[in-house]
């Protein structure tokens, strides 16, 4: 890949190394959840993570990746965020004429070895991105960006909108979450149920982007299909009696079970009748069939 010319507002990740791309795409949502849980300020946290990803792109490509990539990202993103929060605090003090405040523990960077995934806050982040203050289109775009780790270009292609329009939509969505005073807490059962339809749509789009990638050299991006399946399983654990959730998880498992056999050595699609069925994932198929059977029995 080559590096395109970048606008200052375009903070998506462009990487030369495919393995590093997969690593950063997997780590970014985890780092974001840590920052939002610790500091709040979802919009500022998301910007800080994107800046850390750009820093990783430049530094890792030159010097190689650090021993603990997630801790590196967390440290860099935390420092960027803290700098921004301090600047905002200083600006408010100047405007209000208030005496300088003592820094509190929230404005101190966490240690580099702080666990990124002590708690799996993915679902909390997912439902936050589907906040009712946002339009359905904004909910989809923001979740694909923050939780799915897709770039602006990939999301724009998935939603069939111009990239510039999509970037503005994401920016407005983050501002609306801030204006609504949304907190990084799990929604109550009724709120959760109201947002579930959008959540499932988002998870399906993430899976679909991974199963038939719209960009890059690979037809299949297993890190995206695996992440979509993982999060959908978390949602299923949360609402095990919901037939739509079970059906979506079954669809993902049964579809992705054939991934190793659907492309030949030349990268061309292999029709199902010609696929080597010994390469299908029998465990995933069994799990998918069991989900369907349980859903039909209820």
Whereabouts are the PLM-identified features?
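Short, small-residue-biased leader/transition segments that mark boundaries at the very start
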Residues: 1-8
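A short, charge-rich alpha-helical start-of-domain segment used by transcription regulators
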Residues: 12-33, 37, 43, 193-201, ...
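Amphipathic, Lys/Arg- and hydrophobic-enriched alpha-helical face
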Residues: 23-43, 55-59, 85, 127, ...
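The DNA-contacting recognition helix of HTH DNA-binding domains
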Residues: 28, 42, 46, 70, ...
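The N-cap/first-turn positions of alpha helices
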Residues: 28, 137-138
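Structural recognition of an alpha-helix C-terminal capping motif at a helix-to-coil junction
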Residues: 47-54, 67-79
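Arg/Lys-rich amphipathic alpha helix in sigma70-family domain 2
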Residues: 64, 74-97, 179
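Amphipathic helix-loop-helix modules that constitute alpha-helical solenoid scaffolds
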Residues: 88, 95-137, 143-154, 161-298
